[in-house]
Amino acid sequence: MASFLSRLPQGKVVAALIVLLLVVDQVIKIWVKTTMVLGQSHVVAPWFQIHFVENPGMAFGIELGSKLFLSLFRIVAMGFCIYLLAKLVRKREHTLAFLSCLSLIIAGGIGNIIDSIFYGVIFSGSHGQIAQLFPSGGGYETWFHGRVVDMFYFPLIEGVFPSWLPFWGGEEFVFFHPVFNFADSCISIGLILLLVCYPRTVSLLLDGKKTLPEGTTEDSEPTKRE
């Protein structure tokens, strides 16, 4: 498979990857919206639930500023990322694996942007009822004010803080508490892989350098020239 992909144009591979991830993300979200009531849970395992929540903020439910500002910020950020990816693909100086990491981040960002822009218009509300797709009475919000659909919940560790602990003593805690979606996973995995596997390449790009130093490969020591 790796050798087959290496023979394909990088642009087509990363474009196909982004489209595939977007389809998976939206299929999951639409399934949740059209089969579950807000707050409903399906217990898959003691440590994993499909728990339907919506958030107006960023990844993992983080909120920052107004909804319209967040939507516009996402669009600008993803526009820059797409421009950067297209530029790197044209230069043909980076591996497909590196470009795929960027594609994960872009696909995740676009997936949540779709929720923010369209979901408020194409879905009815999910409070106390299953949402309808393209309701006759209109959606639950206006353009750019849709809420992001989250569903993956991993309560891996549950317990109670020791009573002697300041501030939180005696309170219950859950790890991992945030509820997230497939798009959030793509963003997180892409970022982690970039930072762990390609720190030098990322550093050079952030410094505005277009290429790696001569005699080096991505995140390798300089190669000895015979």
Curated annotation (Swiss-Prot):
Function as written in the Swiss-Prot or TrEMBL entry: This protein specifically catalyzes the removal of signal peptides from prolipoproteins.
A molecular-function term among this protein's GO annotations: aspartic-type endopeptidase activity
Catalytic activity entry: Release of signal peptides from bacterial membrane prolipoproteins. Hydrolyzes -Xaa-Yaa-Zaa-|-(S,diacylglyceryl)Cys-, in which Xaa is hydrophobic (preferably Leu), and Yaa (Ala or Ser) and Zaa (Gly or Ala) have small, neutral side chains
Keywords linked to the UniProt accession: Aspartyl protease, Cell inner membrane, Cell membrane, Hydrolase, Membrane, Protease, Transmembrane, Transmembrane helix
Catalytic machinery residues: 150, 184
Enzyme Commission identifier(s): 3.4.23.36
Coiled-coil intervals, chain numbering: none
Protein name as catalogued: Lipoprotein signal peptidase
UniProt subcellular location: Cell inner membrane
Assigned protein family: Belongs to the peptidase A8 family.
HAMAP family for this protein: LspA (MF_00161)
GO cellular component: plasma membrane
Pathway: Protein modification; lipoprotein biosynthesis (signal peptide cleavage)
Gene: lspA
Membrane topology: Multi-pass membrane protein
Keyword rRNA processing: no
Gene Ontology BP terms: proteolysis
Transmembrane segments annotated in the record for this chain: 12-32, 69-89, 103-123, 173-193
Enzyme class (EC, first level): hydrolase
Pfam families assigned: Peptidase_A8 (PF01252)
